[in-house]
Amino acid sequence: FDVGLPQPYRIEGDAVTQRQRFVAELNKETAKQGSYTAAYQTVVDKVAYTWFNRLIAVRYMEVNDLLPSRTRVLSSADGRAEPQIVTSPFDAVLDYTPAEQQQIVTLKNDNKLDEAFRLLFLKQCAALGDCLPRLFEQVDDYMPLLLALSFTDKDGVVCHLVNDIPESDWQDAVQIVGWLYQYYN
């Protein structure tokens, strides 16, 4: 899948361990179901459902000013393309470690804004686990590896959530959440 890229795609650091755990999960599920294809579908569905739930919840919470951090994660209140959490990551009190702070600064300085965004989204989800533990429970450690999240991709889910659905529609939680779940399924 990396045909045409200047260098082959490679993973390093934590992603190596996450991949190993993903393979172990697939093997465990294959043994349980007796079929790699069925196991793969089960694991992919679990991952997709988890991230879908979290994206919808975060979008609802940010539009209705319900995020404890009071910082928008997927959008900005002033209409900028760059989410508020990327513009001002340290306004959100998310208990950053010194290494995370440095990583965020480095990613921003290197103009790797989608990578910073992904890191910040994961950090926000982890923080929400304290107040909404059932929705934002700690994920299996391979799941972040499978989260391809971008705010710059015009065809990406974040762009569509922010730009295709008016914020006023997010005011009626039952209707918008029900519609999205119906569409998802």
Predicted regions and their residues:
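Preference for the N-terminal adenyl/adenosyl cofactor-binding alpha/beta module
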Residues: F1-N185
